[in-house]
């Protein structure tokens, strides 16, 4: 009994003596792991080297050490560091990172075996960390359903863990589910606002929709970790998209200075070299990447992706095919090929590749969207118009086929003549009644809220009039704009910078119709007054921000107009063509215009100052003018500032109720100062409103006429004007107004019918037939009359058989319809 008590006392004593030693060691290892994690998150690789020497037997620290060694390009040594830990624990973190390393250098069979062992291990009572490891392994093996399941299990155990939320978010980004990705990253940042991987994830999730904010997030990552390769390369990619190639090169080289064998960095360097025509450097980067990873088709996919951004879609297709030839399991390349083929109009082969990609990866949102879109396109009506193929939604085709082919013919005839260039066809034009379908057709994802059309060189996609609320845009203006892109993109070999491409298209809008392409004149003048106009060298960057893009479009069009007015149309053509041989903007300007970019900047600045001097003076707001002033004070300010638009408008608004005549006089002064103000802020809108209140319909009509000239999308004002104009006394004027209405809203059956009747009276049977066909197709309330109208126009044009068909349609609806009966007798040569 004593001996037993003595042994028990000794055991307790030994335990008491050893406990502090074990706890201290555990605490030391735990602290070292935390330090290693902080060092890794901060990109301080040398600190991790030191920790690894101090704790050579700890798997977690060994993993950080291997990651830091791999980050410096020594992939073989990184794997050798992990090897003993993998042997001891084939299902641990070291095994996971080994498998990822093996996949990363092209040893696919070994990598899959290693990761499969990670997944097949029998783990009792798995922790959140175990589920995360399984999720990452499943993702690498493209077992996305399993990965999603493991992520859910991990989150259930550790809902606020920033690493789990971030890793899950990265999976969503990979599959283009950016909204879901952002939710995961936001959860991570709630737990740790400075968690670099989550900040980088937010940057990636925002890169498509909000590039400036994405840049801010990426830059915040680099403040925490100057060696975050992902942040550097995202900034490089965004810089490429803004045509800031020098910035992109700097970001890429920052990565390659630390890791000269970084495959994605080599890929972006190759892509940049390719689009700049530096063929030897492109080949060198490709060779370096393939030496590391012999089947790294991703480098060709990335080159194709960047090349496509520069609108060189045929070349993008070639590069993406090279990616697949090198790695037939690269499902992203297969999906990309489908997307690129759609951009060159090869929808049959696009579908084949997209279906292949979708069989491999059913979680890819973009692939799913594009396949669904192709299903939507199947019932579209196809109209062959010379070298153009026009596709219209079946429920819109009966109306839009009367307008789209005619305008497309007019545009291509005018543009090919002016530019002395016939583009390669066929030119595919697709019009979408759903804006989201248009966005998916263009980028693969819904959104693109500000875009109305897109051009890929031989493919044009646009919103139909029904894709947005009537009066918010003009589909004809958009179509003309995009067809101008067809000319300039092909003439330049798809190498045009965006400022010149968009600027030329907006300028061509103004050339086509006096009222098109002028919406930004007043906002641009205000921007000029604030000194916020971009320099020519920076003009491309204006297209990457939602706050500056509208200004960039308009400024670019003014620059193109200045080039034509100063140097001539042939020199503008020469400038566009100069890019075909790979010239950059400065070289192209020198080659085509015979001046350097600074000289062009100086002459453009002078032209803007001259053009906007009067407008800028008129836009200045007098001191003391503010809302709520008494009428006498407003009068005094307006009298003292007769050249102030704001003063005259304020006076007109103040007098509108008490003295309509004086209000109209004030609005007229404002209109003389700035005649082209669009919308409800226009003095013409003020005049129309006051004139209608006082019963002066003639004055209201004149004001609305001026308003609709400068606000060509204002269909409601045009309808109001149509109601005021007496068609019996002024048929030509009424006809012009109705033409404006149907140009914006072709589905207005009543306006189309009224236009048809006026055209028929004027002897223009072609316009009458078209207008009546549209009225019939627009499902009017009085269908019988619509058919009879069309029959009458067809009969007048000598098309008796067609006229008879329409009369019979009318009589089927209303058998006792006298007018239709009379028309039938007339067609048959009889009489009552």
Residues of each region from the PLM?
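Juxtacatalytic substrate-recognition/specificity segment
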Residues: 113, 156, 183, 190, ...
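Canonical tetratricopeptide repeat
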Residues: 64, 97, 131-133, 167, ...
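Structural signature of tandem alpha-helical TPR/SEL1-like repeats
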Residues: 43, 72-80, 106-114, 141-153, ...
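Beta/coil-rich, acidic/histidine-enriched accessory regions frequently appended to metallopeptidases
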Residues: 27-28, 37, 234, 268, ...
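Helix-start (N-cap) detector for alpha-helical repeat units in TPR-like alpha-solenoids
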Residues: 29, 59-60, 92-93, 125-128, ...
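Structural marker of alpha-solenoid helical repeat scaffolds
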Residues: 54-55, 87-88, 121-123, 157, ...
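N-terminal leader/linker segments that initiate helical-solenoid repeat arrays
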Residues: 18-80, 88-89, 93, 113, ...
């Amino acid at each position: 009994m004593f001996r037993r008590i003595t042994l028990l006392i000794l055991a307790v004593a030994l335990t008491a003596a050893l406990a502090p030693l074990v706890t201290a060691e555990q605490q030391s290892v735990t602290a070292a792991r935390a330090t290693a994690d902080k060092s890794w998150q901060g990109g301080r690789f040398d600190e991790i080297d030191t920790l690894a020497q101090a704790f050579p037997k700890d798997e977690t620290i060994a993993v950080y050490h291997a990651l830091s060694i791999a980050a410096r390009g020594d992939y073989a040594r990184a794997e050798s560091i992990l090897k003993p830990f993998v042997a001891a624990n084939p299902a641990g973190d070291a095994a996971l990172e080994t498998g990822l390393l093996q996949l990363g250098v092209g040893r696919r069979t070994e990598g899959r075996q290693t990761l499969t062992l990670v997944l097949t291990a029998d783990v009792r009572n798995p922790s959140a960390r175990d589920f995360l490891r399984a999720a990452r392994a499943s993702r690498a093996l493209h077992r996305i359903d399993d990965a999603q399941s493991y992520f859910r299990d991990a989150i259930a155990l550790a809902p606020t863990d920033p690493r789990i939320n971030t890793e899950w978010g990265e999976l969503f980004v990979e599959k283009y589910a950016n909204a879901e990705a952002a939710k995961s990253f936001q959860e991570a940042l709630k737990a740790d606002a400075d968690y670099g991987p989550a900040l980088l994830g937010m940057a990636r999730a925002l890169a498509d929709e909000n590039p400036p904010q994405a840049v801010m997030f990426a830059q915040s990552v680099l403040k925490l970790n100057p060696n975050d390769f992902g942040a550097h390369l995202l900034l490089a990619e965004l810089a490429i998209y803004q045509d800031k190639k020098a910035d992109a090169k700097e970001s890429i080289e920052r990565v390659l200075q630390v890791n000269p064998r970084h495959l994605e960095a080599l890929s972006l360097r190759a892509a940049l070299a390719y689009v700049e025509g530096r063929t030897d450097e492109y080949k060198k980067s490709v060779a370096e990447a393939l030496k590391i990873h012999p089947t790294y088709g991703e480098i060709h996919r990335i080159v194709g992706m960047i090349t496509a951004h520069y609108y060189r879609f045929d070349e993008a297709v070639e590069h993406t095919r090279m990616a697949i030839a090198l790695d037939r399991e690269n499902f992203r390349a297969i999906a990309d090929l489908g997307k690129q083929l759609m951009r060159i109009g090869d929808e049959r082969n696009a579908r084949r590749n997209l279906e292949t990609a979708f069989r491999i990866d059913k979680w890819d949102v973009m692939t799913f969207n594009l396949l669904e879109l192709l299903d939507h396109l199947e019932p579209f009506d196809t109209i062959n118009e010379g070298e153009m193929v026009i596709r219209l939604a079946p429920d819109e085709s009966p109306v839009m086929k009367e307008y789209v082919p005619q305008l497309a013919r007019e545009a291509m005839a005018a543009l090919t003549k002016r530019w002395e260039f016939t583009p390669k066809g066929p030119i595919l034009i697709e019009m979408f009644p759903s804006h989201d379908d248009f966005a998916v057709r263009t980028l693969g994802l819904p959104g693109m809220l500000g875009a109305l059309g897109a051009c890929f060189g031989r493919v044009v996609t646009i919103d139909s009039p029904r894709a947005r609320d009537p009066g918010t845009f003009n589909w004809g203006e958009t179509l003309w704009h995009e067809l101008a892109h067809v000319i300039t993109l092909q003439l330049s070999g798809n190498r045009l910078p965006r400022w010149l491409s968009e600027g030329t298209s907006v300028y061509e809008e103004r050339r086509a119709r006096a009222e098109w392409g002028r919406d930004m004149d007043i906002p641009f003048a205000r921007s000029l007054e604030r000194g916020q106009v971009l320099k020519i060298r920076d003009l491309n960057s204006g297209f990457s921000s939602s706050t500056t893009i509208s200004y960039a479009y308009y400024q670019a069009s003014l620059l193109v107009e200045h080039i034509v007015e100063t140097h001539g149309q042939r020199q503008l053509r020469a400038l566009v063509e100069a890019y075909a041989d790979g010239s950059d903007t400065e070289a192209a300007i020198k080659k085509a215009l015979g001046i350097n970019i600074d000289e062009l900047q100086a002459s453009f600045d002078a032209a803007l100052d001259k053009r906007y001097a009067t407008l800028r003076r008129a836009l200045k707001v007098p001191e003391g003018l503010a809302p709520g002033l008494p009428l006498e004070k407003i009068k005094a300010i307006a009298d003292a500032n007769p050249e102030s638009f704001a003063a005259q408008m304020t006076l007109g608004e103040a007098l509108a109720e008490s003295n309509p005549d004086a209000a109209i006089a004030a609005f007229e002064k404002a209109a003389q100062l700035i005649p082209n103000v669009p919308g409800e802020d226009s003095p013409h809108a003020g005049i129309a409103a006051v004139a209608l209140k006082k019963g002066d319909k003639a004055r209201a009509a004149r004001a609305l006429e001026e308003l609709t000239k400068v606000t060509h999308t204002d269909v409601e004002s045009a309808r109001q004007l149509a109601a005021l104009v007496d068609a019996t006394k002024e048929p030509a004027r009424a006809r012009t107004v109705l033409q404006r209405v149907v140009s914006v809203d072709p589905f207005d059956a009543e306006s189309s019918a009224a236009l048809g009747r006026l055209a028929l009276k004027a002897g223009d049977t072609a316009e009458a037939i078209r207008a009546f066909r549209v009225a019939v197709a627009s499902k009017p309330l009085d269908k019988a009359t619509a058919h009879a109208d069309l029959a009458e126009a067809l009969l007048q044009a000598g098309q008796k058989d067609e006229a008879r068909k329409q009369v019979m349609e009318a009589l089927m609806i209303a058998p006792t319809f006298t007018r239709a009966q009379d028309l039938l007798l007339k067609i048959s040569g009889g009489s009552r």
